[in-house]
Regions:
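Short leucine-rich amphipathic alpha-helices used at interfaces
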Residues: 47, 53-54, 59-61, 65-67, ...
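N-terminal signal peptide c-region/cleavage motif recognized by signal peptidases
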Residues: 15-18
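Surface-exposed, charged secondary-structure patches
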Residues: 102-144, 196-209
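Early exported N-terminus immediately downstream of N-terminal targeting peptides
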Residues: 23-104
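Bacterial N-terminal signal peptides that target proteins for export
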Residues: 1-8
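Surface-exposed, polar/charged faces of alpha-helical domains
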Residues: 24, 43-46, 50-54, 83-87, ...
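Short beta-strand edge/turn micro-motifs at domain boundaries
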Residues: 143-171
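Low-complexity, intrinsically disordered terminal/linker segments enriched in charged
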Residues: 161-209
Length: 209
């Protein structure tokens, strides 16, 4: 239950805003996005029923555009990122993005009226990296801190990491990825991610038949 709460709350904070992202401060962006996705879930009966295709479409359209996956992949890969070729880096980012689609889609299926409470933003004008702090609250459960690490890019503010209870979401993959690289190399990691993503796509396709 605790993992479902934390992951679902991550999704709830990242839907598409009603105005261009670059016009909003980072905290206003995340707050606006959370309201947008809540409204989408509440009016879409297919999402509420757990329709995989509809949920994946919501994730693709409203959540993923607000992530810097290259930055997230660099954190997850650690020192191994420097060893990867440009082509391998591109493949890693693509497969990691697909992996997170699955994570967020699963979280949306388990949404149960969690609430986000935002903290005042501590940042200076001109800062290119900021932390948007919040807490996830649910009846009968302990509040969980959730901090969004964001950076300003030419296309607006992007999330590159989320810290849940102080633990980096991107860094949670680091040990697994490092072990895979030790055992099978970077190509082995890419193949492993690709295989898992294909298996998930096949399962989702069978559900939609």
């Amino acid at each position: 239950m605790r993992n479902t709460l934390k992951t679902a709350a991550l999704v709830l904070a990242l839907a598409a805003p009603t105005s261009p992202a670059e016009e909003l401060t980072p905290d206003a962006l995340v707050r606006t996005l959370s309201l947008e996705v809540l409204a989408t879930i509440r009016r879409d009966k297919d999402i509420q029923a757990g329709n995989p295709k509809r949920i994946a479409s919501l994730v693709e359209a409203k959540i993923l555009p607000h992530f810097d996956f290259a930055h997230t992949a660099r954190i997850a890969m650690g020192a191994n990122w420097r060893r990867a070729s440009p082509e391998q880096r591109e493949q890693l980012v693509r497969e990691f993005r697909t992996l997170l689609v699955r994570t967020y889609s699963s979280a949306l299926m388990n949404y149960r009226d969690q609430v986000l409470e935002f903290k005042p933003l501590r940042a200076q004008p001109g800062d290119a990296q900021v932390t948007v702090r919040s807490e996830v609250r649910q009846s009968g459960a302990q509040a969980v801190s959730m901090d969004y690490e964001m950076e300003k890019t030419p296309s607006g503010w992007k999330v590159y990491d989320v810290k849940i209870g102080g633990a980096s979401l991107a860094a949670t993959y680091r040990d697994t990825f490092a072990e895979e690289v030790r055992n099978h190399g970077i190509e082995g990691l890419i193949d492993s991610l690709s295989s898992k993503n294909r298996q998930n796509d096949a399962r989702r396709a069978s559900i939609n038949i």
